[in-house]
Design a protein with these regions (language model features):
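A solvent-exposed interaction/effector surface
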Residues: 2-185
């Protein structure tokens, strides 16, 4: 019984490397809206028709060794998700040690991509994400962007930081790239 409890605890307190960023400005403590700077990162991504729901499994296979180097790669946070009317896209951030040496994917349709450094606005929310929550917090973020005079570069993405089996203190964010703010180097 003690072994089972220790195993269960290890799952719930497991720490993952998290994509680094710098908070440049906080806009709303209640809604946890922040302007951030993200340095370049290496990601592995896959896009599929909305009806198909295998993106996470395909990416998990990649980090589990289904890559050209047959190398296991540590899970990181966050997981990026976005969608259009026809497609859904998911991306894993790779550990920083793979910035220049990430193994090539074996799966067709999966791509390695190095992101450019950039400025992003984020809003944080808890619980499990749903279409309704994503729409609600995306609208709150858009309102702040408009009131603060920021222009966006691209569509928002949902970021998830927690495993599906984590039931409390969950962290999700909506993130959208913005044009470089005045006075930022």
């Amino acid at each position: 019984m003690l072994v089972y409890i220790l195993l269960l605890l290890s799952v719930f307190i497991q720490k993952y490397e998290t994509q680094p960023y710098e908070v440049l400005q906080e806009f709303d403590q209640t809604d946890q809206i922040e302007l951030r700077f993200y340095p370049a990162a290496m990601m592995v991504a896959i896009e599929s028709p909305k009806a198909r729901n295998g993106n996470f499994n395909a990416l998990f296979r990649y980090i589990s060794g289904n890559n050209e180097a047959q190398e296991k790669i540590a899970m990181t946070t966050p997981v990026y998700m976005s969608s259009t009317a026809q497609t859904q896209r998911m991306a894993f951030v790779l550990p920083q040690k793979y910035m220049h040496t990430a193994p090539l994917p074996k799966d067709e349709g999966m791509e390695l991509m190095k992101t450019s450094p950039g400025y992003f606005m984020a809003i944080r929310f808890g619980g499990y994400s749903s279409a309704e929550k994503v729409a609600f917090y995306t609208q709150k973020l858009r309102s702040t962007l408009a009131s603060e005079g920021y222009n966006t570069k691209g569509a928002p993405a949902l970021l998830s930081y927690d495993a599906p089996y984590k039931f409390y203190n969950r962290r999700n964010e909506i993130l959208v790239e913005v044009e470089r703010p005045n006075g930022q180097d």
